[in-house]
C-alpha cells in the first residue's frame, strides 16, 4: 500500500511539473497586452450539417449555436505593438458546406529557437448553426467553450479550460493542461471520447442515460454518481467499466494526471440502473494486502 501510494505520488509529481512548465512557457511567450487591437466581423452561409473548423494559437474561443444557416465570425486581434498586431492574420475559407477559420503568423513566429516573440493574440466568438459539425476546433493557449451544438464536436486545447454543454452527438475532446467539462443534453448512438493529460475531467450525463462506460486514470481518482465500481490497480492507476440503463452509447474517458468525475444531471428523470463489467470485484491493491 505504501509503495503504491508513493509511486502514484511520484508519477503525479513528474507529470504535474512537466505540464506546469508547459503552462509557464505558453504564458510567458504569448502576448496578453491589449495596447493595440483590431476587430474582424464577417458572416458566411453554411448548409445544414455543414462543417466548421477553427485553428487558433493564442486567445479565447467561444462557440455558440444559433438557428441560422450561417456562421458569424467576430474576432478581436490584440498585441503589445503595432508590428505584432499586423503580423497576425485571420484567414477564412468558405465553400457553402464548410467554413474554416485560422490564425496565421509569419514563419519565424512558429519556431522555438528565437520565434514566439510576443505574438499577437486573437479572441474568437463564433455563432454557428445548431446542427453544424465542429470538425476540428484547435486551440493552443486560452479557454475554449462550446454551447448548444447538437451535431459532432471534435475539439482540442493544449493550455486552458475547456467547457462544452448542450451536447447531443458524437464528441471527441482532448486537453493537455486544463480542466475539461462536458455536459450532455442527450446521448446518440455515436461514440464519446474525452482525454486529458493534466487536469480533471467532469462528464455530466442525462439521469436516464443508456451507455457503456469505460474510464481510466494513471494518477487520479474516479468518482461516479451511478454507483459503478472503481478498481484500484496494484501500482498505478484506477479504472471503471460498466453499463448504464442496459448499455448504449460507447463512452471512453482517460486521464493521466487528474480526476475523472461522472455525474448525472438534475433533470428529474429516474437514474439509470448500473451494471459493473469488471469481473473482479476486488481491488488489485486488496490482493496485495492479502499477500503481505
Region locations from a protein language model:
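Intrinsically disordered, low-complexity terminal regions
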Residues: 2-292
Amino acid at each position: 500500500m505504501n509503495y503504491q501510494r508513493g509511486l502514484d505520488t511520484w508519477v503525479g509529481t513528474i507529470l504535474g511539473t512537466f505540464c506546469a512548465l508547459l503552462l509557464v512557457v505558453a504564458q510567458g511567450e504569448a502576448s496578453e497586452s491589449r495596447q493595440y487591437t483590431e476587430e474582424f466581423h464577417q458572416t458566411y452561409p453554411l448548409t445544414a450539417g455543414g462543417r466548421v473548423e477553427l485553428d487558433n494559437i493564442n486567445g479565447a474561443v467561444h462557440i455558440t449555436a444559433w438557428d441560422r444557416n450561417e456562421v458569424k465570425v467576430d474576432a478581436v486581434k490584440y498585441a503589445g505593438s503595432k508590428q505584432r498586431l499586423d503580423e497576425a492574420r485571420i484567414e477564412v475559407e468558405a465553400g457553402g458546406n464548410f467554413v474554416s477559420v485560422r490564425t496565421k503568423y509569419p514563419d519565424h513566429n512558429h519556431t522555438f529557437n528565437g520565434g514566439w516573440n510576443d505574438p499577437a493574440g486573437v479572441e474568437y466568438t463564433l455563432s454557428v448553426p445548431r446542427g453544424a459539425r465542429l470538425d476540428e476546433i484547435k486551440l493552443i493557449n486560452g479557454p475554449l467553450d462550446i454551447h448548444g451544438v447538437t451535431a459532432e464536436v471534435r475539439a482540442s486545447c493544449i493550455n486552458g479550460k475547456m467547457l462544452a454543454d448542450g451536447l447531443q452527438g458524437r464528441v471527441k475532446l482532448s486537453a493537455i493542461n486544463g480542466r475539461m467539462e462536458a455536459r450532455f443534453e442527450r446521448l446518440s448512438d455515436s461514440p464519446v471520447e474525452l482525454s486529458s493529460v493534466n487536469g480533471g475531467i467532469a462528464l455530466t450525463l442525462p439521469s436516464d442515460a443508456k451507455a457503456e462506460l469505460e474510464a481510466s486514470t494513471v494518477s487520479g481518482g474516479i468518482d461516479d454518481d451511478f454507483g459503478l465500481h472503481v478498481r484500484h490497480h496494484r501500482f498505478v492507476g484506477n479504472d471503471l467499466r460498466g453499463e448504464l440503463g442496459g448499455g448504449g452509447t460507447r463512452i471512453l474517458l482517460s486521464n493521466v494526471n487528474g480526476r475523472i468525475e461522472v455525474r448525472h444531471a438534475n433533470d428529474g428523470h429516474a437514474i439509470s440502473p448500473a451494471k459493473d463489467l469488471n469481473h473482479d470485484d476486488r481491488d488489485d491493491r486488496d490482493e496485495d494486502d492479502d499477500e503481505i
